[in-house]
Amino acid sequence: MIEFILNGQPVRVTEVPEDAPLLWVVREHLKLSGTKFGCGLGLCGACTVHINGEAARSCITPLSVVARQSVTTIEGLDPQHAHPLQRAWIAEQVPQCGYCQSGQIMQAAALLKKVPKPSDAQIVEAMDGNLCRCGTYQRIKIAIHRAAKEAA
């Protein structure tokens, strides 16, 4: 049995191996489908969540790592879907297929928590490894700048 906080609520996971990927626990056992499976190797960023406020790849994070920790998924970033990044994503028309967006937003949220007004270089560095098969990287960067201004 593993207990942790998920999106602000206590969760107890039983009958799941401790080495099961957090991604599968969140999606299959806890029925939160916003976090996506991309590569399964932690290389694409589609599965990004926050563990204690830090961006982490949930596809390679064993469930045991989050015992007594706080995990936030895209569903918990803002229950009203009104986080500055979510609004900026819409305003800047970032999504095309949308598959990578939850991971992109979660990675960007971790960046803005550390660096409230990031430079282009800081954005590029922080977002490196979050892949977008549609190539909307420029719009992602613009949306992050927009969210930073809005949050200030």
UniProtKB/Swiss-Prot annotation:
2Fe-2S ferredoxin-type domain span: 1-77
Pfam families, per database record: Fer2, Fer2_2
Tree of life domain: Bacteria
InterPro entries assigned to the protein according to its UniProt record, in alphabetical order: 2Fe-2S-bd (IPR002888), 2Fe-2S-bd_dom_sf (IPR036884), 2Fe-2S_ferredoxin-like_sf (IPR036010), 2Fe-2S_ferredoxin-type (IPR001041), 2Fe2S_fd_BS (IPR006058), Beta-grasp_dom_sf (IPR012675), Diverse_Oxidoreductases (IPR051452)
PROSITE patterns, per the entry: 2FE2S_FER_1, 2FE2S_FER_2
Enzyme Commission number(s) of this protein: 1.3.99.16
Record-level Gene Ontology MF annotations: 2 iron, 2 sulfur cluster binding; isoquinoline 1-oxidoreductase activity; metal ion binding
Signal peptide interval: none
Reaction catalysed by this enzyme: isoquinoline + A + H2O = isoquinolin-1(2H)-one + AH2
Enzyme class label: oxidoreductase
Chain residues that bind [2Fe-2S] cluster: C39, C44, C47
SUPFAM superfamilies, per the entry: 2Fe-2S ferredoxin-like (SSF54292), CO dehydrogenase ISP C-domain like (SSF47741)
Keyword hit for Ion transport: no
KW Ribonucleoprotein (keyword) present: no
Keyword annotations from UniProtKB, A to Z: 2Fe-2S, Iron, Iron-sulfur, Metal-binding, Oxidoreductase
Binding partners and assembly: Heterodimer of an alpha chain and a beta chain.
Role noted for this protein: Specific towards N-containing N-heterocyclic substrates, including isoquinoline, isoquinolin-5-ol, phthalazine and quinazoline.
Name of the protein this chain belongs to: Isoquinoline 1-oxidoreductase subunit alpha
Phylogenetic lineage: Bacteria, Pseudomonadati, Pseudomonadota, Alphaproteobacteria, Caulobacterales
